[in-house]
Amino acid sequence: MTRTFPGTVFSNREGVTLPENGCGITVGNFDGVHLGHREIVARLISLVQSRGLPAVALTFDPHPAELLHPGLARHFLTTTRRRAELLLSLGLDAVFVLNTTRELLNLSAEEFYSEVLCRRFRPAAIAEGEDFHFGHNRQGTLSDLQRWADRDSIALTAVTPVQIAGTAVSSSRIRVLLEEGNVADANDLLVFPYRVEGQVVEGQRRGKALGFPTANLGNVHTLVPHDGVYAGVATTASGARYGAAIHVGKNLTFSATERTIEVHLLGFTGDLYGQLLQVEFFQRLRSTEKFDGVEALREQLHADVVHVESLSRLNVGKPQTQGVSLSSTRFSG
């Protein structure tokens, strides 16, 4: 009996189908979509352009680590939809997202190659990083993939990891930088500045009373940088972009115990409750601190806003991945 592995395909056009003569494909988790991923995608596109074949990515939802290590608290850099959006912005024709199941994770490397890659996608070309592993317990290596690809007359390109400051760019390296609050260095490794998104929820309205109203972000499903005050840009559901002073952490002046994300949108007037808000982080300005009183806090908030104004003017223009309009379709695998 033929096993099927269903999922969702994302594209910036309707009705994506793979031609009978195959496609170019790259497989990975692509968390964050960083400079190394961009290099792999660029090499893949160059492989298939002359053949007139589509270039696609294959990824997984949920992340395999969530099934393999369910008790391990780990926050990822991008949602599935955001990963697809970023990958498509690099020029891919489609992003296929397989439903991650135990059955899928238990496939041997050769079973994954034959039953998923070859049977479903009929690849004419594959591009992967030199450290690529696949199959049950990551047992498959690039050497295995090369051997089978040679047998099946599939062009395989191995891409050397991109290095910045002498160290390979990786999702785990970016994760560490963000957990340290070093968003500027993290952004140097990413294709686009780091972003979180969530729904604006009711807060304590302390910012409004101080003259600096904030949107309180809830339902954030990706990694939130280390506590501190940041300069960034916020994008509303309508697509309007504003310079933003972002406070991450507990409000120590008011002895708050809950960690929150509070965003002051420079020049914005209106009500954002219930709306989706996207927040990009550009630079960490300072640590959170407890002030002696409300006036001292107000003075610092004013200084933060002035600082953000001096940094954000060049970054409030076009939104990230402008022009990528996602459509999604279920596929049976």
Task: Describe every region a protein language model picked out.
Residues 203-333:
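Phosphate/ribose-recognition catalytic cores of enzymes acting on nucleotide-derived substrates
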Residues 103-213, 288, 292-298:
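Classical nucleotidyltransferase
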Residues 75-83, 107-113:
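Glycine-rich, highly charged phosphate/nucleotide-binding loops
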Residues 2-15, 96:
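Short acidic-hydrophobic, aromatic-tinged amphipathic segments that line or gate anion-handling sites
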Residues 79-95:
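A glycine-rich helix N-cap at a beta->alpha junction
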Residues 16-79:
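N-terminal catalytic cores of NTP/NDP-binding nucleotidyl/phosphoryl-transfer enzymes
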Residues 58-61, 90, 95-103, 160:
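A conserved beta-strand->alpha-helix junction
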